[in-house]
């Protein structure tokens, strides 16, 4: 009897972020990682939401264009932009800039836009969504902020607070429809998109998808 099983398309995470990779691994589904080569500079006059959505879609499309897959691929692109006092907050890159970020946000609310795109190369369809998270920071002594930074070295994280680690101690409250959005990959939105693309999330084993 011929094999009539319809196999799902290859799933690719378009990201170099170890945090996003760790989140996607929670779902227990097979995927590959390809880092997009993309200029992530915001456009003049672009809102934080527009920047995040544009970059998430651009990452997914850029990676899809490099993949030779006759059966198609599903590519996950994600981008996060933080905004505070009307300005976009980037990744600090250094200890000094991270400390300055945290000091400026003491007792204040920061808005995080976690944009997600699922691009289906079979149809050319791109599902996109922006999940907004409001975060209120505690007021802490600068010495504690410095100690946190030396412990976590979150210099590749927008806003300098890694909520999945010790950074949670910097926060008073998190308000979001998706608890994984703040870490960088909104899994509630992603699983909704995968279902819409007919991806079999509940296959019993990895072998069922091979």
Swiss-Prot record:
GO terms for biological process: nucleotide metabolic process. Its cofactor is a divalent metal cation. It is an enzyme of class 3 (hydrolase). The keyword Transferase does not apply. It is found in: Cytoplasm. The active site is at residue 79. One of its GO terms (cellular component) is cytoplasm. The record marks 19, 80, 164 as: Important for substrate specificity. GO terms for molecular function: nucleoside triphosphate diphosphatase activity. It catalyses: N(7)-methyl-GTP + H2O = N(7)-methyl-GMP + diphosphate + H(+). Its EC number is 3.6.1.-. Belongs to the Maf family. YceF subfamily. This is 7-methyl-GTP pyrophosphatase. It comes from Burkholderia lata (strain ATCC 17760 / DSM 23089 / LMG 22485 / NCIMB 9086 / R18194 / 383).
């Amino acid at each position: 009897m011929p094999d009539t099983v319809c196999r799902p398309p290859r799933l690719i995470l378009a990201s170099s972020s170890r945090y996003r990779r760790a989140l996607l691994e929670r779902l227990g589904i097979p995927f590959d990682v390809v880092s997009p080569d993309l200029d992530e500079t915001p456009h003049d006059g672009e809102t934080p939401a527009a920047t995040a959505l544009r970059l998430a879609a651009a990452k997914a499309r850029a990676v899809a264009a490099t993949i030779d897959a006759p059966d198609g691929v599903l590519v996950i692109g994600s981008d996060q932009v933080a905004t505070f006092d009307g300005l976009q907050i980037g990744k600090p890159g250094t200890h000094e800039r991270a400390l300055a970020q945290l000091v400026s946000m003491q007792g204040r609310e920061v808005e995080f836009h976690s944009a997600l795109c699922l691009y289906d190369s079979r149809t050319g369809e791109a599902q996109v969504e922006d999940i907004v998270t409001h975060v209120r920071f505690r007021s802490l002594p600068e010495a504690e902020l410095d100690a946190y930074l030396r412990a976590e070295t979150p210099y590749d994280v927008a806003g300098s607070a890694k909520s999945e680690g010790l950074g949670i101690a910097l926060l008073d409250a998190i308000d979001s429809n998706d608890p994984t959005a703040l870490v960088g990959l909104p899994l509630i939105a992603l699983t909704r998109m995968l279902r819409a693309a007919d991806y079999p999330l509940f296959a019993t084993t990895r072998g069922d998808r091979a």
